[in-house]
Amino acid sequence: GLDAARREDGAALRDLLLGHLDAIEALTLRAEADPSREPAAIRARLAEQVRLLLDAGAPVDEARLHMEAAFLAAKADIREEIDRLKTHVASGRSLLAAGGPVGRKLDFLSQEFNRESNTLCSKSNAASVTAIGLELKAVVDQFREQVQNLE
């Protein structure tokens, strides 16, 4: 009957959402493992940015240079975003495993995924991580669209 059909639809939607969570997790792990996040790669990018500052010919005082370098290093660190994405994936899986009306909670989670993927893109100063961030945003959009179909 109608209840059986709704249960089947619900199971199919759950499987689809779990697939999106798997994709979000895989992209998060790719960003985490990206070679651009190695300290040597970050140092090289910082050195290049500092060189550009110095080449601009403007007088640069030592304190300002240290401040800029610290700022650039902090901006490049996406550890928190990666940790939060992993936590949100685990939360999504728990919600889907629990069953029941989880639409509103998953909608909130999709907003969190969106926020973290946006931050990942804006913080990234490596093309490879930005590309992963953009892929992540696409999967998050698909996840959010499917969540809209939930009760």
Which ranges hold each PLM region?
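N-terminal intrinsically disordered, cationic/polar leader segments
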Residues: 1-151
